[in-house]
Curated annotation (Swiss-Prot):
Residues 86-154, 209-421 form a coiled coil. Belongs to the GOLGA8 family. This is Putative golgin subfamily A member 8I. The gene is GOLGA8IP. The lineage of its organism: Eukaryota, Metazoa, Chordata, Craniata, Vertebrata. Its main location: Golgi. It comes from Homo sapiens.
Amino acid sequence: MAEETQHNKLAAAKKKLKEYWQKNSPRVPAGANRNRKTNGSIPQTATSGGCQPPGDSATGFHREGPTSSATLKDLESPCQERAVVLDSRSVEISQLKNTIKSLKQQKKQVEHQLEEEKKANIKKQKAKRVLEVQIQTLNIQKEELNTDLYHMKRSLRYFEEKSKDLAVRLQHSLQRKGELESVLSDVMATQKKKANQLSSPSKAGTEWKLEQSMREEALLKVQLTQLKESFQQLQLERHEYAEHLKGERARWQQRMRKMSQEICTLKKEKQQDMRRVEKLERSLSKLKNQMAEPLPPEPPAVPSEVELQHLRKELERVAGALQAQVKNNQRISLLNRGQEERIREQEERLRKQEERIQEQHKSLQQLAKPQSVFEEPNNENKSALQLEQQVKELQEKLGEEHLEAASQQNQQLTAQLSLMALPGEGHGGEHLDSEGEEAPQPMPSVPEDLESREAMSSFMDHLEEKADLSELVKKKELCFIHHWRERCHQKTHHLLSEPGGRAKDAALGGGHHQAGAQGGDEGEAAGAAADGIAAYSNYNNGHRKFLAAAHNPADEPGPGAPAPQELGAADKHGDLCEVSLTSSAQGEAREDPLLDKPTAQPIVQDHQEHPGLGSNCCVPFFCWAWLPRRRR
């Protein structure tokens, strides 16, 4: 359409030029024009007024000869001038045609460049849409990652709580293991002492005691198998948790790699867009330079100003469109820069999230290391008081005839305990090594990244739970001590208020076999009662020592525990014939810096589960000074 309008305009301009030339050119006679178009022959019959009638040719010729030559000369000079003017005008017309052709070519080039720019703009818009879609996908992936992180944190908290419970159980089992080892060593010593003091008991009683000890051994074996099975289950759960963490980590790394690849492709596309923009800017600068170049000077006689003005307007319009395109390209470049900044911010956020996740894995590994140390002995804690009570009963009841059988049983118990300790330690070490190689490092009790609200709230909840647990432990310890004191007072009151004074005399003289005339059976019963009183008094004394050592970690004796000198003096006077079964365990508990809290909870649980363990009597400390006076 544009070319047709241009052709129409050129045809109209040519018509106007012809009309203008016809109006301004002087009129020439038709005969002169015809004679001019011939081969240069001068007509003889041409006159100023037209053709004359044929008359006397000779007279007419000779009569009008000088006038016709003058008129011919006068006519030839303007004709020549007009011919020159026509030649110059034809040259100018050819020049104008050439300029019009060059302008048409420039216009075609400009239109071609505009079409290319439109295509480039369309491509840029498509790329922009693709970038927006990719940004939306990145945001969706970011939200998915956040949800995955939240679920991982919840699972980590759940496993942390489990590991804390396991650590507490392991700590109690370690304590009871040391106590049992010390108890076994004390049992051997006390059995040797009692071999010299005790008389031979009846065969029926010894057989019954042996059967009871065998039953207790069977129960202990069953408990050992249960403990081993529970330990294996804990190891399997731990390995499964480590594998789960590995899978989560690998999946998260794959997502990060995909996102990094997408970011690289976006950067490449952006570089390509920038190159295209630079090319367009160069082409625009070239076009501006071409437009700024001065056109060739127009001849003054060419009347094509309307067409030139129209062409100038079209060029101005094209220049305005190009400037608008340049502005649009600049705006697109600004938008691309903003998108680049957003992408960089997203990369920084993702990097920070990755660092936080790595720190959490490291802290989890650091927390798993101390938990594996306390993992083994936790399972032995339940049967600790049972073993101690069983050893005490064996100490009181076994006689001289079955000392060898009792020593063999004690050796079997020690072998079982050593077997429990050795595979537990071996498995624990291997488990620690395998965790150090495989499992991701766990979170410490105090999180390092306290900037996030979730970490801060979880840390505060952890501290509150810890404080509540410590308060509960203290309350249970106080209740346990109060209960044991009341029970000891009741038992001693019952023994002292027994009619006939048999219990008092038996308690006083049973240890040294001073029963008198009442017979050997009463003396033996009284000696057993006295031994039970002394053993339980030592147990209470050792338990108070243990509580004092737990509350005073600086190896200072507690206010309720007696001094070592007093204990030694009491042993010299013969008050306490029995050795405390828990003194060495208490010393180990004092020396061990990991045992910050007493084992009140398992003791209370065992006492509630087995109420018959504490059926024997206990003598308080104020009765110790009374016993030697009665013996004297």
